[in-house]
Amino acid sequence: MTFKAEYIWIDGTEPTAKLRSKTKIITGQPAGLDALPIWGFDGSSTNQAEGHSSDCVLKPVFTCPDPIRGGDDILVLCEVLNIDLTPHASNTRAALAEVAERFAAQEPIFGIEQEYTFFQDGYPLGFPKGGFPAPQGGYYCGVGADEIFGRDVVEAHLDNCLKAGLAISGINAEVMPGQWEFQVGPVSPLEVSDHLWVARWLLYRTAEDFDVAATLDPKPVKGDWNGAGAHTNFSTKAMRESYDAIITAAESLGEGSKPLDHVKNYGAGIDDRLTGLHETAPWNEYSYGVSDRGASVRIPWQVEKDGKGYIEDRRPNANVDPYVVTRLLVDTCCSALEKAGQV
């Protein structure tokens, strides 16, 4: 027998990488990740190589059922390697794997809230051509054809993620018309990142069938309209047991150069979204607070009440690389917790 394997990878486009994929026909029974062959592609067409030395290598790192094709067909997320099998410069997963392994004993886990916006014919869904809809207010978690746009795509995407076995944990309509969110986690750093990249691919691929485009642009409409983020919820074993560890983690993100070190890697266009308006903190200031959606980092009220839990970094853009944001949070917070003896 044969089956189709859709090899998916992250390209070298700057400042925001794109997803690419192509299909390999494999003979035999599906036998898991380790049985999948490495493959290759033309890196000169993906901003990952020069034409005179264009070969790049695809190494499978995660696989799941293909919910669109069905049957025995699979999706295969890959790392990009050089031909000497070292990580390619665009491969951010390899660096996360090292940091995640170093701090594995602290048991870090993540939940990421992926916001995105639907466009059709150059306009956000729900925006009249050449004009604007009613101001924000009734769209968030709304219901009804006058306030909700694209639900058929959202439901199809949710079903596809569930069929694929991804760790998707919810969906909701967002503040701007045509803007939605899905959540992945809580799971380990590598798992949340792998699953989010595949969920993004499924979002684009599902929307294709509806002749709709999905964008992770952090500020898709200028003016008094919310941007799109990827709020990143994070905890360690100590944070899930102690409020002191929560404070240590929140404080560590504001120390020295850490605020800028993080923000400059939280997605292109961060200054367009983090203005201090529309439930954001200014990009060049750091703050944290309980139940404060205008802070850089929010401590949920339930966490303060329970004396344990997690923090929400509200700064990452919708277009952030999850391998990068999880690596930075694990490195900064786990280092501080280790130094404080809160492990």
UniProtKB/Swiss-Prot annotation:
- The GS catalytic domain covers 92-343
Against Pfam families, the record matches this protein to: Gln-synt_C, Gln-synt_N
Q: What are its cofactors?
A: Mg(2+)
Domain named GS beta-grasp: which ranges? 3-87
What EC class is this?
Answer: ligase
List the Gene Ontology MF annotations in alphabetical order. Answer: ATP binding; glutamine synthetase activity; metal ion binding
Instruction: Indicate which residues the UniProt annotation says bind Mg(2+).
Output: 113, 115, 174, 181
Give residues annotated as binding L-glutamate: 279
More info: Overexpression of Streptomyces viridochromogenes glutamine synthetase confers resistance against the antibiotic phosphinathricyl-alenyl-alanine.
Which protein family is named in the record? Belongs to the glutamine synthetase family.
User: What does the function comment of this entry state?
Assistant: Catalyzes the ATP-dependent biosynthesis of glutamine from glutamate and ammonia.
Q: What is this protein called?
A: Glutamine synthetase
Species per Swiss-Prot/TrEMBL record: Streptomyces viridochromogenes
